[in-house]
Amino acid sequence: MRPAPALALAALCLLVLPAAAAAAAYFGLTGREVLTPFPGLGTAAAPAQAGAHLKQCDLLKLSRRQKQLCRREPGLAETLRDAAHLGLLECQFQFRQERWNCSLEGRTGLLQRGFKETAFLYAVSAAALTHALARACSAGRMERCTCDDSPGLESRQAWQWGVCGDNLKYSTKFLSNFLGPKRGSKDLRARADAHNTHVGIKAVKSGLRTTCKCHGVSGSCAVRTCWKQLSPFRETGQVLKLRYDTAVKVSSATNEALGRLELWAPAKPGGPAKGLAPRPGDLVYMEDSPSFCRPSKYSPGTAGRVCSRDSSCSSLCCGRGYDTQSRMVVFSCHCQVQWCCYVECQQCAQQELVYTCKR
């Protein structure tokens, strides 16, 4: 077995958004443009030079406000790249056995519609950015933030003990400014996008834990230091996938008391006449999704997809059946997480039966 390089998707492509997107200043999987190749940023192999972050920010097709924020913070461009990468990895993992597998092909078409899959893209993109920013602060990669505000623990002391907490407070505050206020929009789709974005942020917040470490002679707990730590992003992805599975279809209604447009779920038999507003943790969508069985502007279809004969082939292959062949399969093994957003693996190989959907 030989070591494999860290997982990299689309040659470390960065998902970007158009410069003139003031009404929907999103980032990551919800960027409105096609993927743009983006070189490695300030890695150990190629350390960032002074002022290099300005060029990196200019390469990102951000809104004017976002570009200003990026240029003020030397560590932000790299963190944005990490967040896009993290969100894409998690999306593809959670939907690996689904007809829509978070393929980059068709992403632009999806973002123009109000499907459940679109809702997930907004949620996981916001969650990844929240997570990556909080981790970047605690890792000392950002100049304008540091560890979380743990009581009685200075940042320098925290780093000395190796207990620097993830700064979720700064992350969520920054993200609100970075994405811009959209809650007051009168457009139903914009309100749905904003709602799903906050579902993603909320999922990260719910995974914040208090971790403690003892200091003392021979392992005694004479002094105990506690700090805030985010749960692994895989757990956040699982929460959001569950929200996707139970997503609520909504329409719009005018709140007469407040005089504004709000999201409402359709009325159910025996329920309120006009339905109920979705809960803060519900993903919301407006249109029923296509089958994703055949190639379309939303996905490449499922022909040729590898499936599990005992579980996913029936649904994944859309009734077309599947082919069986024996081949040498190379797969990632002995994987180890490096910091927040990368996984280093070895490559293993073995002979096995592979099932692929017929065309």
Swiss-Prot record:
It is found in: Secreted, Extracellular space, Extracellular matrix; Secreted. Coiled coil: none annotated. Residues 1-23 form the signal peptide. Gene3D superfamilies: 3.30.2460.20. Keywords: Developmental protein, Disulfide bond, Extracellular matrix, Glycoprotein, Lipoprotein, Secreted, Signal, Wnt signaling pathway. One of its GO terms (cellular component) is Wnt-Frizzled-LRP5/6 complex. CDD domains: Wnt_Wnt9b. Glycans are attached at N101. InterPro entries: Wnt, Wnt_C, Wnt_CS. Disulfide bonds join C91-C102, C137-C145, C147-C164, C212-C226, C214-C221, C293-C318, C307-C313, C317-C357, C333-C348, C335-C345, C340-C341. The keyword Phosphoprotein does not apply. One of its GO terms (molecular function) is signaling receptor binding. Belongs to the Wnt family. Forms a soluble 1:1 complex with AFM; this prevents oligomerization and is required for prolonged biological activity. The complex with AFM may represent the physiological form in body fluids. Component of the Wnt-Fzd-LRP5-LRP6 signaling complex that contains a WNT protein, a FZD protein and LRP5 or LRP6. Interacts directly in the complex with LRP6. Interacts with PKD1 (via extracellular domain). This is Protein Wnt-9b.
